[in-house]
């Protein structure tokens, strides 16, 4: 167990190395961070940190740099996440508030996260299995054709044109719309199949076949597909860190092209109020083992809808990045809840 002074030395080493990308020496630490101890004492502390695997000496004439273990302890000992400035929070709110639909929200979120953190931003679309039906609309296009529109509470819109087996009057269309909304509006998408299992059986014979066709279209519109969408932005930011990856950024870029990998990376963030940090994990895609991932779920009323985060080198400004991810996740959840 490290004492508080050694933790302070480790924090200073991480902060300086993240800022300068240069090995950190004891004299520079004392001067820059006002540690109130001699360089010799700091050297002893650095030797202890090195013995325990928190820092390493890249070559004999150099200072020290943090290891994966050192970054991990640094993050775990952050007592609070550094808050964003009032101006930054207003900019986030203003930028996201201009979104016109779910696709625009996701697109803006990716761009915003990449700009705020100067890392690669990854945003998952809200998954249907975490969504609820907000409203259903039936629009009569002709006597034998209707347009079905289903809107979820996450802003997702699904449309289907339905060819009916027979004529359906305007009054019957309105009645079916009202009854369907009464049955499933406000209900979770995963519960809809059970809720509509006997819906058509309760309809008058004259519109039972139309009801069956419409229910089938509703179920098709709300089927939970596992090809969940993930959007990536800011990949060019990796070019800022040419020395932070063992060989090149190419393996990282290749990993970022695999949706399954990204969903797995973000999937562990399940609570909107929580920020998770993965550093050089071994159980991920090989191309991401030299990276760090900062992620959080977004949602409303404590219910997670999906996740977002950033991918970058282990030499990352963790306090600022964690604050940005937390703030953006909070605003995205709020906007989806309001709209």
Swiss-Prot record:
<comment type="similarity">
    <text>Belongs to the HrcA family.</text>
</comment>
<dbReference type="InterPro" id="IPR036390">
    <property type="entry name" value="WH_DNA-bd_sf"/>
</dbReference>
<dbReference type="InterPro" id="IPR021153">
    <property type="entry name" value="HrcA_C"/>
</dbReference>
<dbReference type="Pfam" id="PF01628">
    <property type="entry name" value="HrcA"/>
</dbReference>
<dbReference type="InterPro" id="IPR029016">
    <property type="entry name" value="GAF-like_dom_sf"/>
</dbReference>
<comment type="function">
    <text>Negative regulator of class I heat shock genes (grpE-dnaK-dnaJ and groELS operons). Prevents heat-shock induction of these operons.</text>
</comment>
<dbReference type="GO" id="GO:0045892">
    <property type="term" value="P:negative regulation of DNA-templated transcription"/>
</dbReference>
<dbReference type="InterPro" id="IPR023120">
    <property type="entry name" value="WHTH_transcript_rep_HrcA_IDD"/>
</dbReference>
<keyword id="KW-0804">Transcription</keyword>
<dbReference type="InterPro" id="IPR002571">
    <property type="entry name" value="HrcA"/>
</dbReference>
<keyword id="KW-0805">Transcription regulation</keyword>
<keyword id="KW-0346">Stress response</keyword>
<keyword id="KW-0678">Repressor</keyword>
<dbReference type="InterPro" id="IPR036388">
    <property type="entry name" value="WH-like_DNA-bd_sf"/>
</dbReference>
<dbReference type="GO" id="GO:0003677">
    <property type="term" value="F:DNA binding"/>
</dbReference>
<protein>
    <recommendedName>
        <fullName>Heat-inducible transcription repressor HrcA</fullName>
    </recommendedName>
</protein>
